C-alpha cells in the first residue's frame, strides 16, 4: 500500500464530517451522549487516587553491610543515619525559632475554659515569655548551662511549653515530674538531679513539695514557682522551711526588668531527663540530648515527606502527658513547621468536646483510647442489622484502604462514618499511635472508619520515643513498621525465652543518634541497657517479617517462671484477652510457686450489660460484677480467644476476679502512658489473688 493511501485512511475526520455526524443523531441520543461524557469527565477528575508509597512495600528495610544482622530503612537511599532534617533546626531551641519564622508570628499555643472557644498565644508571645521566664530564673540563682536542672510538675498546658522553652533558651535541662511517680519517687528525683527550682501548676503540688522539705527529704529545693494563683499562707509556709514561693508571672516580670541575652544549646547538649515510672526500685532518669530529639522526629519527617508532610495550618490536640517523649516528639514536629498545639481542659472525659472545638488535624493517641472508640462505635450498633451494616460498610472501606486509597468522602462515609469523624472535630488527617501494642482488628477498622492516615510506631523513652514507624501506604496490621532512617535495629538471641536470631526472632536492639546517653547517676542500669557497642537493649522480643517490617511478639521484661518451669510473658497474654468484648482492662498474675495463672478483669461498663443480656444474665453493672455466671461467661470467652491465638494451656488463666472500678492514673494502677503498673497491681489485689489460688486449688 502506498504511503499516501495509508495517511488518507488514518487521517482524522474533518470538522464538517463530525458536524454532519452529530446532526444525524436524535436529540435523545445527543442528551445521552452528553450525560455520559459528563459522568466520565466527573469520574476522571474526582476518582479516588491511591497513595504512592515512598518505597517498595515488599522491601521496607535492608540488612546493613557488616552490621551483624542489623537492618535499616530503605527510605531516602542514604547509608548514613539521619541526624537532622533541617540545617536550621538542630536543637529544640532552633526548632521553635524556625516555627516562629515560618508562622509569621501566627498562633502557637491554645487553651480553653469550659464551654468557651480556644484562645491562642502567638509564637512571638511564647518566645518572649520564655526569655523573660528564663531571665527571671537566672536572677533567682539558676545558672546558664546543662548543669542546671529545672523541674516541671504540671499537667499539659501552655505554661509547660513556655517553661520548657525558657530552659532551652539558656541551655538548661528540663526534668518533668508527674503525680503518678509517687511522693517517694519525687523526692528521689529532686535529689538525684540536684533540682533547686520546680515550676508547678497548682498549689497542692507546691504543698506536696514543701512537705518533703519540712521532713528534710529534699534540702536542695529552694524555689517553687506556681502557674496558678495561691494563698499567702503557702508563701509563709515556704519561708519557714527556707523555700521561696513565687508566681510564674512574678518571675517573668523580674526577667523582663533584668533581661539576659539567650545562650542557645548545641545539638550534643543535654535537653531533658525523663524519669520512668511503672518499674520496681527507684525511677531511672533517661538523659536525652537536643540531637536525640531532633534525630527522632527527623526520622518521622523523612518517612512521611512525600505523603503527609506537616503544614503551618496543622493543629494538634495535646492530652497525652508531656512528661512522655511520644507526645513531646509529635509536638516538636508541629512547632518546627509553624503549626498550632491546643491543650485539652485537663479532664479526659471532656476530650471529645475539646476536639470538636479545636478541630485538630493531628491526633496522637494510645491504643487504649482507640480500643474505647472501637467498643463505643460497635456498642451503639445495638441491633444485629445495624452491626451487619456497619461491618459491611467497614469492609468496603477496608478494601479501598488495602488498595492505597484513604478518603472520607465515599458513600460509606456519608452513610455511616461521617458522624464518627465529626466526633474528632472532622478535620483529622493523621493519627499516630504508640506506647503499647495496637489491636490489628481495631486499627484496621479505624483506618477505614476515620478516613485518615493512621500510623503506628514502636519505641521507648531510651530511644527518644520511636525507632520504627509505619511506612505510608502499608496499611496492613500486626506489625510496627520498618526502622526509622535515624536508627538501625538488630535482634539478638533471647535464650531464656527460646528466641533465636537464626529464625529471625530475638530481643530488639537499637542504635543511632536517637538513642539516649544513659541513666542519670546510675552506671549499673546504664550498662544493663547500653552495651559496649552502643546498642540499646529494649527488653522486647521482635520478629522480622518478609517485607522488612518488625513484629513485636513477646516481652523479655516482666517475664516470670511458673512452678513447673515454664516461662510466661503476661503482657502478651493480656493483649490477647483484651480483645474479649466485655473486657475493658485485665491484669494477668503468675507466681514461681504456683503452677497456673490468675487474672483481675475490669468489665467495660458500656458494653458488658448488653453482652450479659445476650447470655441471659440480667442486672445493673454493679450487680453483674458480683454474679458467678457472668464471671464464668467472661472467663470462657477469654479462654476461647486464647485458644484461637495459640496460647499454651499454661498461658491460660484458670480463675479471674471481677473488679468494678477501672485501673487509672489517678488510683496509681496505670502509668501516665496508660500501661499497667504491675508491682502496684500485684500489691493492690494481693488479697483477691490469694483467694483465687486458694479456691482454684
From Swiss-Prot:
Which terms in the Gene Ontology molecular function aspect does this entry carry? arachidonate-CoA ligase activity; ATP binding; long-chain fatty acid-CoA ligase activity; protein homodimerization activity
Q: Where is this gene product found?
A: Mitochondrion outer membrane; Peroxisome membrane; Microsome membrane; Endoplasmic reticulum membrane
Has keyword Transmembrane? Answer: yes
Keyword Cytoplasm in the entry? The reply is no
Q: InterPro entries of this UniProt entry? A: AMP-binding_CS (IPR020845), AMP-dep_synth/lig_dom (IPR000873), ANL_N_sf (IPR042099), LC-FACS_euk (IPR045311)
Q: What does this protein do?
A: Catalyzes the conversion of long-chain fatty acids to their active form acyl-CoA for both synthesis of cellular lipids, and degradation via beta-oxidation. Plays an important role in fatty acid metabolism in brain and the acyl-CoAs produced may be utilized exclusively for the synthesis of the brain lipid.
What family is it from? Answer: Belongs to the ATP-dependent AMP-binding enzyme family.
Name under which the protein is recorded: Long-chain-fatty-acid--CoA ligase 6
Annotated organism of origin: Mus musculus
Gene symbol here is: Acsl6
Amino acid at each position: 500500500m502506498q504511503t499516501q493511501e495509508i495517511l488518507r485512511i488514518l487521517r482524522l475526520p474533518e470538522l464538517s464530517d463530525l458536524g454532519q455526524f452529530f446532526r444525524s443523531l436524535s436529540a435523545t441520543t445527543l442528551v445521552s451522549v452528553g450525560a455520559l461524557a459528563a459522568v466520565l469527565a466527573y469520574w476522571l477528575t474526582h476518582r479516588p487516587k491511591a497513595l504512592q508509597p515512598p518505597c517498595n512495600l515488599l522491601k521496607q528495610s535492608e540488612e546493613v553491610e557488616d552490621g551483624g544482622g542489623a537492618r535499616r530503612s530503605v527510605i531516602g537511599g542514604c547509608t548514613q543515619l539521619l541526624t537532622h532534617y533541617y540545617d536550621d533546626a538542630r536543637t529544640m531551641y532552633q526548632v521553635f525559632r524556625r516555627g516562629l519564622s515560618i508562622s509569621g508570628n501566627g498562633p502557637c499555643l491554645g487553651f480553653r475554659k469550659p464551654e468557651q472557644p480556644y484562645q491562642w498565644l502567638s509564637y512571638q508571645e511564647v518566645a518572649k515569655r520564655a526569655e523573660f521566664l528564663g531571665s527571671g530564673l537566672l536572677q533567682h540563682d539558676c545558672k546558664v548551662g546543662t548543669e542546671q536542672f529545672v523541674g516541671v510538675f504540671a499537667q499539659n498546658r501552655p505554661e509547660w511549653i513556655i517553661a520548657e522553652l525558657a530552659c532551652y533558651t539558656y541551655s538548661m535541662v528540663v526534668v518533668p515530674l508527674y503525680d503518678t511517680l509517687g511522693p517517694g519517687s519525687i523526692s528521689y528525683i529532686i535529689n538525684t538531679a540536684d533540682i533547686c527550682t520546680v515550676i508547678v501548676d497548682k498549689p497542692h503540688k507546691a504543698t506536696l513539695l514543701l512537705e518533703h522539705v519540712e521532713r528534710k527529704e529534699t534540702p536542695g529545693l529552694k524555689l517553687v514557682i506556681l502557674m496558678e494563683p495561691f494563698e499567702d499562707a503557702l508563701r509563709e509556709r515556704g519561708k519557714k522551711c527556707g523555700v521561696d514561693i513565687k508566681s510564674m508571672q512574678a518571675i517573668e516580670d523580674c526577667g523582663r526588668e533584668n533581661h539576659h541575652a539567650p545562650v542557645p544549646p548545641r545539638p550534643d547538649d543535654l535537653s531533658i531527663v525523663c524519669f520512668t515510672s511503672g518499674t520496681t526500685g527507684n525511677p531511672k532518669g533517661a538523659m536525652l540530648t537536643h540531637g536525640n530529639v531532633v534525630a527522632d522526629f527527623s526520622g518521622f519527617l523523612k518517612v512521611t515527606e512525600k505523603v503527609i508532610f506537616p503544614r503551618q495550618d496543622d493543629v494538634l490536640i495535646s492530652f497525652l502527658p508531656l512528661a512522655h517523649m511520644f507526645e513531646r516528639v509529635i509536638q516538636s514536629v508541629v512547632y518546627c513547621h509553624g503549626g498550632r498545639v491546643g491543650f485539652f481542659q485537663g479532664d479526659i472525659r471532656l476530650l471529645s468536646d475539646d476536639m470538636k472545638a479545636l478541630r485538630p488535624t493531628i491526633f496522637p493517641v494510645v491504643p487504649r483510647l482507640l480500643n474505647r472508640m472501637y467498643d463505643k462505635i460497635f456498642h451503639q450498633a445495638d441491633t444485629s442489622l445495624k452491626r451487619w451494616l456497619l461491618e459491611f460498610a467497614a469492609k468496603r472501606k477496608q478494601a479501598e484502604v488495602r488498595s492505597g486509597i484513604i478518603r472520607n468522602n465515599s458513600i460509606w462515609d456519608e452513610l455511616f462514618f461521617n458522624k464518627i469523624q465529626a466526633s474528632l472535630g472532622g478535620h483529622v488527617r493523621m493519627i499516630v499511635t504508640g506506647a503499647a501494642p495496637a489491636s490489628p482488628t481495631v486499627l484496621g477498622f479505624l483506618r477505614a472508619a476515620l478516613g485518615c492516615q493512621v500510623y503506628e510506631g514502636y519505641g521507648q523513652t531510651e530511644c527518644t520515643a520511636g525507632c520504627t514507624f509505619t511506612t505510608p501506604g502499608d496499611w496492613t496490621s500486626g506489625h510496627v513498621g520498618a526502622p526509622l532512617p535515624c536508627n538501625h535495629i538488630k535482634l539478638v538471641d533471647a535464650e531464656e525465652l527460646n528466641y533465636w536470631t537464626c529464625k529471625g526472632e530475638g530481643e530488639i536492639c537499637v542504635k543511632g543518634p536517637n538513642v539516649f546517653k544513659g541513666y542519670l547517676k546510675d552506671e549499673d542500669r546504664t550498662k544493663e541497657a547500653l552495651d559496649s557497642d552502643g546498642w540499646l537493649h529494649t527488653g522486647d522480643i521482635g520478629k522480622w517479617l518478609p517485607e522488612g517490617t518488625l513484629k513485636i511478639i513477646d516481652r523479655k521484661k516482666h517475664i516470670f517462671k511458673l512452678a513447673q518451669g515454664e516461662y510466661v510473658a503476661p503482657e502478651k497474654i493480656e493483649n490477647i484477652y483484651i480483645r474479649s468484648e466485655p473486657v475493658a482492662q485485665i491484669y494477668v498474675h503468675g507466681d514461681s510457686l504456683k503452677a497456673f495463672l490468675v487474672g483481675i478483669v475490669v468489665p467495660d461498663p458500656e458494653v458488658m450489660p448488653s453482652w450479659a443480656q445476650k447470655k441471659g444474665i440480667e442486672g445493673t453493672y454493679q450487680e453483674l460484677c458480683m454474679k458467678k455466671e457472668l464471671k464464668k461467661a467472661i472467663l470462657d470467652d477469654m479462654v476461647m480467644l486464647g485458644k484461637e491465638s495459640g496460647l499454651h494451656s499454661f498461658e491460660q488463666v484458670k480463675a479471674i476476679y471481677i473488679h468494678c472500678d477501672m485501673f487509672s492514673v489517678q488510683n496509681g494502677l496505670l502509668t501516665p502512658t496508660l500501661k499497667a503498673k504491675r508491682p502496684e497491681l500485684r500489691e493492690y489485689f494481693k488479697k483477691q489473688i490469694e483467694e483465687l489460688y486458694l479456691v482454684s486449688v
